[in-house]
Amino acid sequence: MQADPIVKSVMIVLALASLACWTIIIEKLLRFRMIRRQTHAFETAARNGERLTAEASNLAGRIVAAGYGAWRDQDPSESRMERRERIERAMRLALSYDMRHLQTGLPFLATVGSAAPFIGLLGTVWGIMNSFSAIAASQDTSLSVVAPGIAEALFATAIGLVAAIPAVIAYNKLTTDLGRLQQSFIGGIMMLGDHLARDRNHYLRAEAAE
């Protein structure tokens, strides 16, 4: 393709942006799928009052570790409600940290989704202007002269749309999925916090057994 250097640069930038978007999309889909399983196990165990494993290798484990850490730091003078709020606050902070990490890459999808069509349009406008300049210089308005330049220019817009459409769809889906995961974890946190604050002896025996 003998496109103008600027048009060609626009196409390359959009192609690289599209590749980066698909890399983020695939990584996030696989990551969220794994975390969804952790969420289900976390909610089930918290609902049933089972002791959870505080593993630093996964999100649920880090939340549990934060909860157990707050539970161990007990103040005899605090009420059950105060103890529950303190334990839940520690787990929510751990969740918030991981949620921020999971959001990495999503702003890039949003940026590509909103900017790529306009970047492609810029390449198209620039290419059409050059095509008209070439037509004026050659004094030849035949289709064989006009069509290639305009087709190359329009191709920049097409690449922009190809990059933007999946990015927008993925951003909306991943944002929704992330919100649902967060709400599921919050539900588990509330149940676990209640169990830890209410039944201290049960968890104390579990700690001693380990």
Would you name each region that the model predicts?
Residues 139, 143-153:
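Hydrophobic alpha-helical transmembrane segments and adjacent short intramembrane/lumenal linkers
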Residues 12-13, 147, 155, 159:
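Alpha-helical transmembrane segments of multi-pass inner-membrane proteins
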Residues 153-167:
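Hydrophobic alpha-helical transmembrane segments of polytopic membrane proteins
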Residues 2-47, 55:
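Transmembrane alpha-helix/interfacial motif
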Residues 33-142, 169-210:
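Predominantly long cytosolic amphipathic alpha-helical stalk/bundle segments
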Residues 10-13, 17-20, 116-119, 123-126, ...:
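Residue-level signal for the membrane-embedded core of alpha-helical transmembrane segments
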Residues 21-28, 163-174:
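Transmembrane alpha-helical segments in integral membrane proteins
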